[in-house]
């Protein structure tokens, strides 16, 4: 039986708050992948999240406010995921993170930020079956967007 889980690195800053995280979580729970996941672990840095508010989105969501220091970046979440993978080698893990939150909301990059998040979700969430097949051969699978300027 497939064992799968999702680890989300969330950085919460005053400008975006939890907007991108909520968008990502709602996207996840509206897709078939939610039935494959045993849990969704959100590891947050920066402004603490309202844990009951986020966990009430879906019963599989668990939130930890790891640190108020956003400059720790993704490292704590990657370490948590690494430790989990060592203890549970049969799990397939999806890693997502709140992209673009350091950019101002009203800047010219607002729409590219949303498309950046959408591309990550499309490649890993919408195409999860392909990712799971590839994980039978490879240790990691991900996406890489390359723009021609």
Enumerate the predicted regions with their spans.
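ER/Golgi luminal nucleotide-sugar-dependent glycosyltransferases, focusing on the catalytic module
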Residues: 1-149
């Amino acid at each position: 039986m497939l064992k799968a889980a999702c680890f989300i690195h969330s950085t919460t800053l005053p400008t975006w708050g939890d907007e991108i995280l909520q968008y990502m979580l709602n996207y996840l729970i509206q897709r078939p992948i939610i039935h494959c996941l045993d849990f969704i672990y959100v590891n947050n840095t920066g402004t603490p999240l309202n844990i009951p508010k986020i966990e009430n989105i879906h019963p599989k969501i668990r939130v930890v406010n790891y640190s108020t220091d956003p400059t720790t970046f993704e490292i704590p979440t990657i370490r948590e995921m690494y430790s989990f993978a060592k203890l549970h080698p049969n799990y397939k893990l999806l890693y997502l993170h709140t992209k673009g939150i350091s950019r101002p909301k009203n800047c010219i990059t607002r729409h590219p930020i949303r498309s950046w998040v959408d591309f990550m979700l499309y490649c890993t969430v919408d195409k999860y079956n392909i990712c799971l097949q590839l994980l039978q051969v490879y240790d990691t699978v991900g996406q890489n967007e390359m723009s021609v300027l």
